[in-house]
Curated annotation (Swiss-Prot):
Keywords tagged on the record: Cytoplasm, Endonuclease, Hydrolase, Manganese, Metal-binding, Nuclease
PANTHER family: RIBONUCLEASE H2 SUBUNIT A, RIBONUCLEASE HII
Gene Ontology MF: a single term: RNA binding
Organism: Bacteroides fragilis (strain YCH46)
Gene, per the UniProt record: rnhB
Reactions it catalyzes: Endonucleolytic cleavage to 5'-phosphomonoester
Its EC number(s): 3.1.26.4
Chief location bin: cytoplasm
Localization per record: Cytoplasm
InterPro entries, sorted: RNase_HII (IPR022898), RNase_HII/HIII (IPR001352), RNase_HII/HIII_dom (IPR024567), RNaseH-like_sf (IPR012337), RNaseH_sf (IPR036397)
Protein name per its UniProtKB record: Ribonuclease HII
Similarity section: Belongs to the RNase HII family.
Binding residue positions for a divalent metal cation: D16, E17, D108
One GO term of the biological process aspect: mismatch repair
Length: 201
């Protein structure tokens, strides 16, 4: 079972992002405040769950959470400020949108840009340790998946329905064959070192 809180006396929000390692699409983040007595044995790091489980848990989280919100940073913004800062900004935007103001933030990972007037604790692999971070990981992942599925309808050749923008062979081959889209992150190594050689011959 995951831990329900770090400090029982504080209103804590768990924060996580999705899409940091992708070649295309926005980065999404979520912030979730759960009730202190929240329990769910299935709730875990989104990467450990099936797609069906993630969407079922999203309904539970949205129904039972004290507050939840999603923040988004576009590919254009990612290219301007870099993906690390974009991940922090997405989390800040999610916290901005919470209807209940948290007193403490639990952040998945080992780095974070301080949010104004709210202390935080970074937790490596926090989505496998704290319920609120796991809940945030599920919301960020599922809402970003929905977004990439919509983009797939516009640009089906990149297989975003399956790879969600991550650097698969099929995705990189499509970039080499069809070029980029407005949704690709132009500051990323889109073809990969090995494939750059392959397609330049």
């Amino acid at each position: 079972m995951l831990l329900p809180w770090l400090n029982e006396e504080l209103i804590e929000a768990g924060c996580d992002e999705a899409g940091r390692g992708c070649l295309a699409g926005a980065v999404y983040a979520a912030a979730v405040i759960l009730p202190k007595d929240f329990e769910n044995e299935l709730l875990n790091d989104s990467k450990q769950l099936s797609e069906k489980q993630r969407y079922a848990l999203r309904e539970v989280i949205e129904r039972d959470a004290v507050a939840w919100a999603v923040g988004i940073v576009s590919p254009e913004e990612i290219d301007k400020i870099n993906i690390l800062n974009a991940s922090f900004l997405a989390m800040h935007r999610a916290v901005d949108r919470l209807k209940t103001r948290p007193q403490h933030l639990l952040i998945d990972g080992n780095r974070f840009k301080k949010y104004p007037d709210i202390p935080h604790t970074t937790v490596i692999k926090g989505d496998g340790k704290y319920l609120s971070i796991a809940a945030a990981s599920i919301l960020a992942k599922t809402y970003r998946d929905d977004y990439m599925n919509r983009l797939h309808q516009e640009f089906p050749c990149y297989d975003w329905e399956h790879n969600k923008g991550y650097p698969t062979k099929k995705h990189r081959a499509a970039i080499a064959g069809h070029g980029t889209t407005p949704y690709h992150r132009m500051t990323f190594n889109l073809l990969g070192d090995g494939q750059l050689e392959l397609f330049s011959k």
